[in-house]
């Protein structure tokens, strides 16, 4: 039986469906009540015959108005679970009807919160969600593309043909469709037609998994299967103040830490072999390790070195290895280079089981122009500013988020919550914060636009960062939020309710530059640059600083840490030992980049891996041993971390002996525990009778010496400790006469139980 629906109307709708221009398919398709009857109307491109299977009856569907619109009339509501028997190209299959499920997925409150930028769990609605609706299994798709003319779901199960699954336009610029039969692992994209007739194929901005590069499709993935084992870790993390804990971070890039041979197979958890992901075209015999392999190799290594945290350079999905991960296209997906999202969850779980926190680099400042990504998403500048003077980083070739748009801000803030909630990460480091804060960042005059007050500050980005940090600590009070901010923007680590940006740590870029400039000098000229190693103390309590020697310092012709140092090979190693020991005893949390812990000799290469063969040589073994012991010593001495951000925690003994390039200071904790004396000699000249003042007389045990032979030093020192003399110097009546080895740092602990 045919219907009495106006012929012209159906023909026009059919034409729009065939041309992929229909934005309200539910107005035509699925069960429709009409003049006391129910009409089931479907859209089935390329089908030659369709039958409706409902309540045990089979009804032939006719095509009275358009060759691919099939319909059948029923006397009662068919419900939603009826099936269709479809014949296409001689092949018959049965399926449920996508257009039987008319009701909205995104509720009114969801839409309201999203529109105002405050839906902290928006990923639970956006993207592709496996579910069962009235006993029918499939995937619910939801996308934000307000200016699109039409949107369709492309996938393996519809031959990547946008005609098969047009989505329904909803309020607020949303598009929805439930597709029965789509399963976990199904590849998909969105086909977006613009108002001017262009067509783009886009990956899902909220996709939970993506294909391995260079492929760019999204992958239907579950969020609810992994069973976490880290309840105790999470409970303890959120109950403590992260700032009065020891924090020593191993920054690393998963793809260039170590490689495996391509003929070393990896078997997935379900027993199926996994195709190797090549490390680089120029290294065809090497493949990337997987998340499980990294868990087996990386976690024990970092734990043995004594670090408290692993910091991962960006692991959100990105198409280009050469971006180091900083040009993200898949914000809600761990990169598939190393395995599945659940395998990454297991990696984090293993870290927590071994006492290691996990920090990831988060990049909310910009995004790439790749065609499948966020750029010009719905035919308009949806995620970015339209004016390149505020919407583009020309030097980087990337686009800048439009932080004034609520939905864009929501996308990013919810992404932050997502990583903490879904993957149990413990902290973030926000990359290139300065590029977000200043409208004229890397821009010549005439190529930037002032803010509403005529200034260079990006007030929209400021409000976004404040919102992101406020929401983060609201949900996860024990989290770390670290800013890489290279200017003197005030109050970066002050709470948002005090007008700060709300981070709880900031990389001390000034300290890093001063230290490297100083240590690159010929030691005999360091006396003229004493300020480089002392100046940081005068501002160290203005922010909560983290001292970082990062990946940025060992690329682009900057050489590696070892080769920055002057002198012969022994002196180079001694300089590195002294630098690291000064870093570990200086106020502030710690971060070093992979390879620095054993004296990597080449620059970091994202397509290579570390020079592990160097550990067959004693100087490199010694450097690694030094880092091991520094971390062990650091964690055991609260004076080195308990009061990092309280002026009581540090006091100079002498910072003015520039002639000898020697400094001395105390580290202590306000709770009255032990305190330490640190003496550093930054020249190749040793001193056998060097005197420093101390506040209390007695015995001072030498508890750390970078010149120890186990680190590659010459084993000069103070025979395990020294007694004080009544000799007034540096404002103290008691003093120590010390042997100071060349290019060394010594640490002493006052022992009140041992007599003079």
Curated annotation (Swiss-Prot):
Keyword Glycosyltransferase: yes
Cellular component aspect of the GO annotation: cytosol
EC number(s) per entry: 2.4.1.18
GO molecular function (one): 1,4-alpha-glucan branching enzyme activity
InterPro entries membership: A-amylase/branching_C (IPR006048), Branching_enzy (IPR037439), GlgB (IPR006407), GlgB_N (IPR054169), GlgB_N_E_set_prok (IPR044143), Glyco_hydro_13_cat_dom (IPR006047), Glyco_hydro_13_N (IPR004193), Glyco_hydro_b (IPR013780)
Reactions mediated catalytically: Transfers a segment of a (1->4)-alpha-D-glucan chain to a primary hydroxy group in a similar glucan chain
UniProtKB keywords: Carbohydrate metabolism, Glycogen biosynthesis, Glycogen metabolism, Glycosyltransferase, Transferase
Pfam families, A to Z: Alpha-amylase, Alpha-amylase_C, CBM_48, GlgB_N
Subunit structure: Monomer.
Function: Catalyzes the formation of the alpha-1,6-glucosidic linkages in glycogen by scission of a 1,4-alpha-linked oligosaccharide from growing alpha-1,4-glucan chains and the subsequent attachment of the oligosaccharide to the alpha-1,6 position.
Similarity field: Belongs to the glycosyl hydrolase 13 family. GlgB subfamily.
Name of the featured protein: 1,4-alpha-glucan branching enzyme GlgB
Underlying gene: glgB
């Amino acid at each position: 039986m045919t219907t009495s629906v106006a012929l012209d109307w159906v023909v026009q709708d059919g034409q729009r469906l065939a041309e992929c221009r229909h934005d309200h398919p539910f107005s035509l398709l699925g069960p429709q009540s009409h003049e006391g009857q129910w009409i089931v109307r479907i859209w089935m491109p390329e089908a030659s015959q369709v039958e409706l299977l409902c309540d045990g009856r089979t009804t032939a569907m006719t095509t009275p108005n358009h060759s691919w619109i099939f319909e059948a009339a029923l006397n009662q509501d068919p419900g939603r679970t009826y099936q269709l028997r479809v014949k296409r190209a001689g092949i018959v299959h049965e399926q449920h009807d996508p257009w039987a499920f008319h009701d909205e997925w995104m509720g009114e409150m969801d839409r309201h919160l999203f529109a105002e930028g405050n839906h902290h769990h928006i990923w639970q609605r956006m993207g592709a969600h496996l579910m069962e609706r009235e006993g029918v299994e499939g995937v619910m798709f939801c996308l934000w593309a307000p200016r699109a003319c039409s949107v369709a779901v492309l996938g393996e199960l519809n031959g990547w043909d946008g005609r098969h699954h047009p989505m329904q336009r909803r309020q607020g610029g949303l598009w929805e469709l439930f597709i029965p039969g789509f399963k976990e692992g199904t590849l998909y994209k969105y086909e977006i037609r613009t108002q001017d007739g262009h067509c783009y194929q886009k990956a899902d901005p909220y996709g939970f998994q993506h294909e391995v590069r260079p492929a760019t499709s999204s992958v239907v993935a579950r969020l609810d299967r992994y069973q976490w084992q880290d309840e105790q870790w999470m409970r303890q993390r959120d109950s403590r103040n992260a700032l009065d804990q020891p924090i020593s971070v191993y920054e690393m890039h998963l793809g260039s830490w170590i490689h495996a041979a391509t003929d070393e197979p990896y078997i997935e958890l379900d027993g199926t072999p996994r195709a190797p992901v090549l490390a680089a075209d120029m290294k065809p015999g090497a493949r990337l390790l997987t998340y499980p392999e990294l868990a087996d190799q990386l976690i024990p290594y970092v734990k043995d070195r004594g670090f408290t945290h692993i910091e991962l350079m960006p692991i959100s999905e990105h198409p280009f290895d050469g971006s180091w991960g900083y040009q993200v296209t898949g914000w809600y997906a761990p990169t598939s280079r190393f395995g599945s999202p659940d395998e990454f969850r297991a990696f984090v779980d293993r870290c927590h089981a071994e006492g290691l926190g996990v920090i990831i680099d988060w990049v909310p400042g910009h995004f790439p122009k790749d065609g499948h990504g966020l750029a010009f998403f719905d035919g308009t500048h949806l995620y970015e500013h339209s004016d390149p003077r505020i919407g583009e980083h020309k030097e980087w070739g990337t686009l800048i988020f439009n932080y004034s748009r609520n939905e864009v801000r929501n996308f990013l803030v919810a992404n932050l919550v997502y990583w903490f909630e879904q993957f149990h990460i413990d902290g973030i480091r926000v990359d290139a914060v300065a590029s977000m804060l200043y409208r004229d960042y890397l821009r010549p005059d005439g190529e930037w636009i002032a803010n509403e007050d005529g200034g260079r500050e990006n007030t929209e980005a400021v409000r976004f960062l404040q919102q992101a940090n406020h929401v983060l600590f609201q949900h996860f009070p024990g989290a770390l939020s670290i800013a890489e901010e290279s200017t003197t923007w005030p109050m970066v680590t002050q709470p948002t309710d005090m007008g700060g940006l709300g981070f709880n740590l900031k990389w001390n870029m000034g300290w890093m530059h001063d230290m490297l400039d100083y240590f690159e000098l010929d030691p005999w000229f360091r006396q003229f640059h004493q300020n480089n190693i002392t100046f940081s103390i005068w501002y160290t309590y203005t922010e909560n600083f983290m001292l970082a020697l990062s990946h940025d310092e060992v690329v682009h012709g900057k050489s590696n840490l070892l080769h920055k140092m002057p002198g012969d090979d022994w002196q180079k190693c001694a300089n590195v030992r002294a630098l690291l020991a000064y870093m570990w005893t200086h106020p502030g949390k710690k971060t070093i980049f992979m390879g620095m812990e054993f004296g990597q000799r080449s620059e970091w290469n994202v397509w290579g891996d570390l020079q592990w063969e160097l550990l067959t040589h004693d100087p490199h073994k010694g450097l690694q041993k030094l880092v091991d012991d520094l971390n062990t010593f650091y964690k055991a001495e609260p004076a080195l971390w308990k009061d990092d951000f309280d002026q009581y925690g540090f006091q100079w003994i002498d910072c003015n002996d520039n002639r000898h390039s020697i400094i001395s200071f105390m580290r202590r904790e306000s709770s009255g525990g032990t305190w330490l004396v640190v003496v550093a000699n930054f020249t190749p000249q040793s001193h056998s009778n060097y005197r420093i003042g101390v506040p209390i007389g007695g015995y001072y045990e030498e508890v750390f010496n970078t010149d120890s032979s186990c680190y590659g030093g010459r084993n000069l020192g103070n025979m395990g400790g020294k007694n004080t003399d009544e000799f007034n110097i540096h404002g103290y009546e008691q003093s120590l006469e010390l042997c100071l080895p060349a290019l060394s740092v010594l640490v002493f602990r006052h022992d009140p139980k041992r007599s003079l």
